[in-house]
Amino acid sequence: MTKEVYVIDTETSTTHWTEGIPNGHIVEIGVAKVNLEKFTVLPAWKFIVSDPSASPSAWIFENTDLTYDEVMEGTNPLIVSKFLEDKLKGKEVTAYNIAFDSMMLDRDMPYLNNCVRWGQDLMIQSSKVPGIPRKHAGKDTWPRAEDSYNYLCPKDPCNLHGKEKHRALDDAEMEGHILLELFFRGLYTLKE
């Protein structure tokens, strides 16, 4: 059995949160395949997902190169969900902050969320590594993905130059390298 884990990342059209729930929907989803025997991270799939309710002033459009028009012309979420269900059913999947990605998937693509086997959360596992910065805006927090990547991957295999792109596939690949480093340190264990 090949030791593979799929890393999923979502980007959303969120403009604000109400009682811990974001108002947006998934507008981009990226999946990277991590092979723990070959120590590789490869792009698997990426989709721009249609969200007719998206606001042109959403954070994602103002802080990345993803455009409002791309999302308006994106793939129907049901088509994306069905494709990824077929590819990922029964596979081990993880994310950096599973609680967020799982919440978004549960709302927008529930069948996909329920057909995968969630592995260990990369954010929680990264918090066990001494030295990764845990302060953001002056507050103690969970380590941010880019801080974990910069600390664990000083050779910068994704050529990010210290800055997370906030594009789903790019971030999934970055998080895949975090997974490899956690695995090397014995901080990520495959589900059997």
Name these PLM-found stretches:
Residues 2-110, 116, 146-153:
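Conserved non-catalytic scaffold segment of RNase H-like nuclease domains
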